[in-house]
């Protein structure tokens, strides 16, 4: 077991606690105490519960500056799609970059809006960057009859796989 001390501990219940210790074993919090014996002092920091990012588009994590604002939403969406088609940064690398950024920012749960179900990608599985809770919403782009038909088949497979998985 390890004991960590922080200037502030916020559990989500009540006011933040000053100079609190948390006891952790095998990655799980066992309890909170105020006994400073053998505590690893984290300094002037706050410990907070894991954060939730309720709207992510991780495949666009490689965009380093905002895309040009355009006069209307459809034109802006076209610029996003064009960026993705022209980007030299691969989608999986962009997703991994976004997952790493999330993890380093204290995010433990995400709700991802994705054009492709990337959760079973070997590269992403091996990275171990996937948050403990990941909810995925599929986004389908393209209005042609041909695109709609293939997307409908893909959506049915996605729904069935996720219903079967619980």
Where are these regions (language model features)?
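Short beta->alpha connector loops
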Residues: 113-118
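Short acidic/polar active-site loop segments enriched in Thr and Asp
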Residues: 108-109
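Histidine-rich, glycine-flanked metal-binding segment
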Residues: 1-3, 8-48
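Metal-coordinating catalytic core of metallo-dependent amide/deamination hydrolases
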Residues: 119-166
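Active-site gating loops and adjacent loop-to-helix segments of metal-dependent hydrolytic enzymes
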Residues: 61-93, 135-138, 166
């Amino acid at each position: 077991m390890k004991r960590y001390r922080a200037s502030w501990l916020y559990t989500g219940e009540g006011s933040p606690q000053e100079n609190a210790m948390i006891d952790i074993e095998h990655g799980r919090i066992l309890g909170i105490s105020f006994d400073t014996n053998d505590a690893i002092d984290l300094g002037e920091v706050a410990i907070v519960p894991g954060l939730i990012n309720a709207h992510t588009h991780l495949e666009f994590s490689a965009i380093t500056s905002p895309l040009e604002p355009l006069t209307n939403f459809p034109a802006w969406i076209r610029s996003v799609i064009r960026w993705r088609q022209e980007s030299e940064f691969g989608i999986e690398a962009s997703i991994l970059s976004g997952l790493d950024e999330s993890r380093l920012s204290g995010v433990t749960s995400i709700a991802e809006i994705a054009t492709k179900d990337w959760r079973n990608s070997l590269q992403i599985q091996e990275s171990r960057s996937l948050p403990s809770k990941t909810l995925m919403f599929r986004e389908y782009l393209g209005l042609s009859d041909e695109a709609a038909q293939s997307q409908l088949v893909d959506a049915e497979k996605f729904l069935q796989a996720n219903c079967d998985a619980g």
